[in-house]
Amino acid sequence: MKKKKSLIFAVSIALAFGLTACSESESTDVESASCEKADLATIAEGKLTIATGEPAYYPWVIDDKPESGEGFEGAVAYAVANQLGFSNDEVVWVRTTFDGAVTPGEKNFDFNLQQFSITEERKAAVDFSSPYYTAPQAIVSYKSSKIAGKTSIAELKDAKLGAAVGTTSLDAIENQIGAKPQVFNDNAAGVTALKNGQIDGLVVDLPTAFYLSGVEVTDGLIVGQLPSTGAGDQFGLLLAKDSKITTCVSGAVDAITADGTLAAITDKWLATDAGAPVLKP
């Protein structure tokens, strides 16, 4: 399996067992009667229809085959489906554009996952589940860089690191690494500086790091990701506005967070296998 990096790269838990609001009389018009599989108002009876992009990229989906369950979002999708009571064979995959998914209106899916950041603006048009991912910060460099192969934050104290102004990435250089950053107007300017050897590494969120290291930077690599602080964009499963299963889907995400399933998936697909190890102190 060729790992071709390409475009686009937790919180307090409310256990699924406690999500009883969906059975209250005043909410039965917008939510399923319960979160039992037989009671879920899915697009197709007895099936769970999940959408992703066309194409879907590594490391979110491997080889553009979400049905394999390989890749971070492929694995998350099946974990949520199983938590809701659906077997893998009862999952149906469809494809949508990113913009089409976030536009108000009827949907041909029960939920969609394409690294949708949860924002107030989008929440006016669609529903989101509880977050299944909070994007950490990562350091992009290139193979001949002096920081290539470094495995700890301590080894980066004297490195020339840059980030875009006003970003969480800039804060991470100062607060997590303890270095004085070079500040750029945007990531594009930072990439140019990296290519010209003016900086050793550019700090961006991990999804952006996958893209930059695979597409924009020759011989690019991800030195590593910084330990998560809980800050950063949060991704949620996207559902139609006022979907009858939003509460149940959120409950499933909360449950796989609570039992460690989500952490294991994250470690496998967005750290160990993705070539983006978490840097040691």
Sequence positions of predicted segments:
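Ligand-binding clefts/hinges and TM-proximal coupling segments of bilobed small-molecule sensing domains
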Residues: 29, 38, 90, 169-182, ...
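Acidic, polar ligand-binding/catalytic clefts
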Residues: 90-153
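Periplasmic-binding protein-like
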Residues: 54, 134-141, 210, 214-251, ...
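Extended ligand-binding regions for polar small-molecule ligands
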Residues: 23, 74, 82-83, 234-272
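A ligand-binding cleft/hinge motif common to bilobed small-molecule-binding domains
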Residues: 100, 116-125, 200-231
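C-terminal motif of bacterial Sec signal peptides marking the signal peptidase cleavage site
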Residues: 17-21
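Bilobed "Venus flytrap"/periplasmic-binding protein-like clamshell domains
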Residues: 50, 69-83, 116-117, 135-191, ...
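Extracytoplasmic small-molecule ligand-binding "clamshell" domains
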Residues: 31-112
